[in-house]
Design a protein with these regions (language model features):
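Surface-exposed amphipathic alpha-helices with a cationic face
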Residues: 148-152
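Aromatic-lined carbohydrate-binding/catalytic grooves of carbohydrate-active enzymes
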Residues: 107-140, 170-176
Length: 198
């Protein structure tokens, strides 16, 4: 099997076309229609600064933004301490998947969907294709897998959301000034559309 090299190839191989009428034919699962209430979780290395939002990793490289200024004040210059350095500070030391799942169940949730990988390229699950995973860096545990087991044990549906499609441009701001984004040693995480053009 060959790996598709373009988005068009992926679409052509899939069950849908890239238009709304094709998606409209998709049968919505009964568990979703009947679920009424679910929990979507945004949590990852971007929560370390406890500043801004899950877009901190992008905005910290946008000169003049509140996140950029916060990062400089708290961590120093972006060349010496960038987003990659926040990842190992993301320890998830108080993460208790059983406690989370029980809270979700008591709230009446029927399904739980965490973001498995945000635009930052850091996978919250075990993955053989990257060293930038919660199993290999930061918490050094499969937080998504642990949460999945706890949620399913309580008879709730578990899903995972991937936001990686926007990773290719997410760190572009760091190319405009001296930052770790410009260092080829970190290209496997801090990928930019500029790198795609080379």
């Amino acid at each position: 099997m060959t790996i598709p090299s373009t988005v068009r190839e992926v679409i052509d191989r899939g069950p849908f076309r890239d238009d709304w009428s094709s998606l409209a034919d998709y049968p919505v699962p009964a568990w979703y229609q009947d679920g009424k209430f679910g929990i979507f979780v945004h949590w990852g290395a971007y929560s370390v600064p406890a500043f801004g939002s899950e877009w901190y990793p992008r905005n910290m490289y946008v000169q003049g933004s509140p996140e950029y200024e916060h990062h400089r004040e708290v961590y120093g210059d972006h060349e010496s301490f960038g987003y990659k350095d926040l990842i190992d500070r993301f320890t998830a030391e108080r993460f208790d998947p059983q406690q989370w799942a029980e809270l979700f169940r008591r709230a009446g949730a029927r399904f739980v969907v965490p973001v498995g990988e945000h635009h930052d390229g850091f996978a919250m699950y075990d993955c053989s294709r990257s060293e930038w995973t919660a199993v290999r860096r930061g918490p050094r545990r499969d937080v998504t897998g642990e949460l999945a087991a706890a949620v399913r044990a309580r008879q709730m549906v578990f899903g995972v959301s991937s936001h990686r499609a926007e990773h290719w441009w997410f760190f572009n701001g760091g190319m405009a000034f001296p930052s770790d984004v410009r260092d080829p040693a970190w290209a496997c995480l801090l990928y930019t559309s500029d790198a795609a053009d080379e």
